[in-house]
């Protein structure tokens, strides 16, 4: 294991342990958040299942929003956090690439998000009439592939907003708005003239019956574009001086 790979491993481990410590210290806040998300998930699924959408599809949409939103938020907020504590320069000089650092942080966040989503699913399974056995039984390989590709695209957006955080200070508010845009674009039908805009939102592609190979290509294109935009933002911020300012 090389020095830089070891450094990334310790970043993942420390981030996971820190999240565990936060979970213990702020357990009440986490419980309230899980209850709120459980209620939102139930209301969305109950409302749209009456419009003919399958339970498996609705669960997949909510999963994309829940995990994808956390991925994007974590990647953008990590930059602001490290700048605030004055550790961004150290990471920049000692980790192979900031892109790798953000990827590791996002993987840790995704793991926790999946665990929390499992808790939400358990709550809905125990206390509502929603049958998760039916949902999982009806979920097709295509559904799983769409979820994976949507989360890959979310990584691209995470890099994009992280790059903006290197240059601008007030990016977190836009990230929050974009998170709800993901939710809106997946569940709400929009006029055809806005279809191009919703197509830019991860996970909304399936409503247009996009072939799976095109979905895969689009998600990888989003990831590449986000990666490149972050690299450009990094160069601009180091030359312009915003990289070194909190």
Residue ranges and their predicted role:
Residues 1-246:
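Hydrophobic transmembrane alpha-helices and immediately adjacent juxtamembrane helices
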């Amino acid at each position: 294991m090389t020095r830089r790979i070891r450094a990334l491993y310790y970043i993942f481990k420390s981030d996971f342990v820190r999240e565990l410590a936060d979970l213990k210290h702020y357990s009440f806040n986490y419980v309230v958040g899980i209850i709120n998300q459980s209620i939102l998930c139930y209301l969305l699924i109950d409302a749209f299942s009456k419009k003919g959408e399958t339970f498996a599809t609705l669960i997949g949409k909510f999963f994309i929003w829940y995990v994808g939103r956390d991925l994007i938020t974590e990647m953008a907020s990590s930059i602001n956090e490290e700048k605030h504590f004055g550790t961004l320069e150290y990471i920049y000089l000692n980790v192979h690439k900031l892109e790798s650092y953000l990827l590791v942080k996002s993987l840790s966040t995704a793991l926790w998000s999946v665990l929390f989503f499992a808790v939400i699913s358990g709550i809905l399974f125990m206390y509502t009439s929603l049958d998760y056995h039916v949902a999982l039984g009806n979920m097709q390989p295509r559904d799983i592939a769409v979820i994976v590709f949507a989360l890959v695209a979310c990584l691209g957006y995470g890099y994009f907003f992280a790059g903006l955080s290197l240059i601008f200070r007030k990016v977190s508010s836009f990230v929050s708005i974009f998170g709800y845009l993901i939710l809106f674009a997946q569940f709400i039908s929009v006029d055809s003239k806005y279809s191009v805009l919703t197509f830019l939102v991860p996970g909304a592609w399936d409503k247009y019956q996009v072939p799976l190979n095109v979905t895969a290509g689009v998600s990888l294109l989003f990831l590449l574009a986000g990666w490149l935009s972050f690299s450009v933002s990094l160069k601009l911020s180091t030359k312009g001086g915003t990289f070194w300012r909190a």
